C-alpha cells in the first residue's frame, strides 16, 4: 500500500481523473479558489495565490490541512468568511482514506501535535445505512466491527468504538443484527451503540408518528426493534448515541425524525418499563437557528425521565463566531438554554463529528473555539471530559 503520502498522491490523481471533465465542478472550484485566496484578511494573514483544479489539488489540500497552514475564520476581515474549497477536497480525501490514516490524522491534530488541544480519547461511531440508502456497504458489518476493535487495541484504547444498530435490519433478520451488536458490547470492547434517525425513523414512537418509507417495516415493527436495543443497553449500562440535528436526511421529513418528539416518546416508554437508558443526543439539536430543538432537548434533560439524557456539541461550527450575527446567534441560544436549564452543566459534552468537521477551516482549532464560546456559561471541566465519563464510562 505504501506510505500515507504515496496513497494520497495516487488518490489525488484518481479524483482529478474522475472530475476533470466536469465543467460545472471545475468552474465552481476555480472561481471559489480565486474568491477565497483574494479575500481581505487581517494584518499579518497574507492571502495566497489561487490554484486551478489539477491532479495534485487534493494532495495539496490534504498537505495544507495536515500542516495547519490554512487561515482561521478569524483571519478574514469580513463577517462571513469566503468559500473554502480546500475543505471540500480534504473532506473527500479523508472519506476515501484508510481508517488508520484518519485516526492518525485526528490524533496528530487534537492530541500529539505541538499545538494540539489535548484530547485524551476519542469515541469512533460506526453507522449502518443498510436498506435506507443504497448500495449496501462493500465491507460486511462484522468485518467493520473487527477492524474498529483492532484500531482500539492498537491505539491502546485511545479510540473507543461504538457499534451501529439498524432497526430495519433488526426487524427482518431474526435477531442477527441485535446479536452482532450485543457481541460487540459484551466481547469486543465497544462502549456504546450508534443509531441514525435521519435515515427515516424516530428513536421511538414510529407506530404513531412515523414516516412511511417504501419497503420498510411498519412503525410498530421499528419500535419493537428499537425497544429491544434500548432495554438491552439499559440493562448493560451502555449508552446509545443518535443524530439529533435537523440535517443529513433525504428531505425535511426525514430530518424531522431526529427531533425531540421521538425522544419524548422514548423516555416515556422507558419510564413505563422502569428502565433508564443512557442517551447521547448527538449535535444537541443542531447549531442552526431554524428550530427550538436544543431548548426542547434541554427541557427533557431536566425531567425525571431524562435523568440519563446527555448531548454533545459535535459540529456546532457556528460557535466559531467570527462576528457574523447568524453565527454568534448559536452561542447566544446555547447560553440561554444553559441559563434556563442548569442541568446542562451536568450533561453537555464536547464533540467534534470530526469527519464532517474536516471540511472546515482549521478544524484542529475547533475545541479551542468551543472553549472560548462556552467558558462563561458552561463548566469547562464537565464539558471537556467529566460529562463524557458519566455518559460513556470512565
Say what each PLM segment does.
Residues 70-72, 78-110, 134-151, 174-183, ...:
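Well-ordered, non-membrane alpha-helical segments in soluble/globular domains
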Residues 115-256, 310, 315:
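Active-site gating/metal-coordination segments in enzymes
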Residues 2-97, 101-107, 191, 197, ...:
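Mid-to-C-terminal alpha-helical segments outside catalytic/metal-binding sites
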Residues 106-120, 150-159, 188, 228-238, ...:
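A structural motif corresponding to the C-terminal end of an alpha-helix
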Residues 228, 232-239, 243-247, 266, ...:
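Noncatalytic carbohydrate-binding groove/subsite architecture in carbohydrate-active enzymes
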Residues 1, 127, 244, 284, ...:
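Active-site metal-binding loops of divalent metal-dependent hydrolases
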Residues 272-394:
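H/E-rich (His + Asp/Glu) clusters that bind or coordinate divalent metals
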Residues 2-14, 135-140, 250-263:
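Aromatic- and acidic-residue-enriched segments that line the glycan-binding/catalytic groove
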Amino acid at each position: 500500500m505504501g506510505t500515507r503520502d504515496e496513497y494520497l498522491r495516487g488518490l489525488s490523481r484518481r479524483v482529478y481523473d474522475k472530475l476533470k471533465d466536469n465543467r460545472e465542478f471545475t468552474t465552481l472550484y476555480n472561481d471559489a479558489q480565486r474568491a477565497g485566496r483574494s479575500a481581505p484578511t487581517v494584518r499579518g494573514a497574507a492571502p495566497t495565490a489561487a490554484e486551478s483544479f489539477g491532479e495534485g489539488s487534493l494532495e495539496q489540500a490534504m498537505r495544507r490541512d495536515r500542516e495547519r497552514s490554512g487561515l482561521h475564520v478569524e483571519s478574514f476581515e469580513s463577517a462571513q468568511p469566503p468559500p473554502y474549497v480546500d475543505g471540500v477536497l480534504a473532506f473527500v480525501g479523508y472519506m476515501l482514506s484508510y481508517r488508520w490514516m484518519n485516526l492518525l490524522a485526528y490524533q496528530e491534530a487534537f492530541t500529539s501535535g505541538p499545538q494540539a488541544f489535548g484530547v485524551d480519547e476519542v469515541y469512533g461511531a460506526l453507522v449502518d445505512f443498510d436498506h435506507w440508502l443504497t448500495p449496501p456497504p462493500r465491507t460486511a458489518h462484522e468485518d467493520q466491527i473487527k477492524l474498529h476493535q483492532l484500531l482500539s487495541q492498537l491505539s491502546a484504547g485511545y479510540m473507543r468504538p461504538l457499534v451501529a444498530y439498524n432497526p430495519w435490519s433488526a426487524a427482518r433478520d431474526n435477531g442477527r443484527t441485535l446479536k452482532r451488536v450485543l457481541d460487540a458490547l459484551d466481547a469486543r470492547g465497544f462502549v456504546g451503540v450508534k443509531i441514525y434517525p435521519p435515515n427515516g425513523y424516530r428513536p421511538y414512537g414510529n407506530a404513531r408518528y412515523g414516516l412511511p418509507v417504501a419497503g420498510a417495516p411498519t412503525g410498530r415493527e421499528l419500535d419493537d426493534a428499537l425497544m429491544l436495543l434500548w432495554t438491552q443497553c439499559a440493562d448493560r449500562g451502555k449508552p446509545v448515541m443518535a443524530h439529533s440535528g435537523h440535517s443529513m436526511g433525504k428531505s425535511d421529513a426525514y430530518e424531522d425524525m431526529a427531533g425531540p418528539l421521538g425522544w419524548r416518546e422514548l423516555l416515556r416508554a422507558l419510564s413505563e418499563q422502569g428502565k433508564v437508558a443512557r442517551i447521547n443526543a448527538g449535535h444537541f439539536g443542531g447549531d442552526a437557528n431554524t428550530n427550538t430543538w436544543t431548548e426542547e432537548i434541554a427541557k427533557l434533560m431536566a425531567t425525571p425521565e431524562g435523568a440519563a439524557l446527555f448531548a454533545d456539541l459535535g459540529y456546532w461550527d457556528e460557535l466559531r463566531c467570527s462576528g457574523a450575527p447568524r453565527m454568534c446567534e448559536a452561542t447566544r441560544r446555547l447560553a440561554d438554554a444553559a441559563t434556563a436549564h442548569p442541568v446542562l452543566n451536568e450533561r453537555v459534552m464536547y464533540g467534534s463529528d470530526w469527519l464532517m468537521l474536516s471540511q472546515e477551516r482549521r478544524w484542529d482549532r475547533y475545541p479551542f473555539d468551543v472553549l472560548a464560546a462556552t467558558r462563561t456559561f458552561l463548566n469547562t471541566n464537565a464539558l471537556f471530559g467529566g460529562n463524557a465519563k458519566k455518559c460513556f464510562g470512565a
